Amino acid sequence: QVIAFSVGVFVVPGLTSDLLAQERSISDGVYTAEQAARGNREYTQQCATCHSTNLRGGEMAPGLVGQTFISGWSGETLWTFADYTNATMPQDSPGNLSVQALNDVIAFILSSNDYPAGDAELSLDLESEGDPIIID
């Protein structure tokens, strides 16, 4: 007795490239240099006391550059990082940064980790994740 199996593959032109195009990473230039400069000023005022001026962390807070940042957040979305940061920072008043200030500080953190700037500002919406931007 012979049993036959049939496997069908349907290819929709452009679908694969459309799906791949939706997933971006922080290596794709997801913030502007001007935004990172604003973020530097905001970081200095709101974050440097605990995370240090060089973003390497201290007794009270982890570093935000190098392996500490990369190993802690690799594979997560930038939205997840923003949501966590918004919920827990600044430590003395979590959630008090404006969405613009939070995006600017994240742009500064990305810049400090040598991720490239791009042509459009980072504009994460804390109400919904939107298109995922992967931390790589």
Regions found by a protein language model. Name each.
Residues G39, Y43-N54, V105, I109:
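The canonical Cys-X-X-Cys-His
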Residues G29-V30, N54, G63:
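Conserved beta-strand positions that form and line the central face of beta-propeller blades
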Residues V65-D83, Q91-N103:
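Electron-transfer interface patches adjacent to heme c in soluble/periplasmic c-type cytochromes
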Residues E34, R38, E42, E59, ...:
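Extracytoplasmic/secreted proteins, especially bacterial periplasmic and envelope-associated proteins
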Residues E59-V65:
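Short cysteine/histidine-rich zinc-coordinating motifs and their immediately flanking basic loops
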Residues Q1-G14:
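Bacterial N-terminal signal peptides
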Residues L19-E42, S93:
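Electrostatic cytochrome c docking/interface patches
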Residues R24-I26, P94-D136:
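Flexible coil segments in periplasmic/lumen-exposed cytochrome c-class electron-transfer proteins
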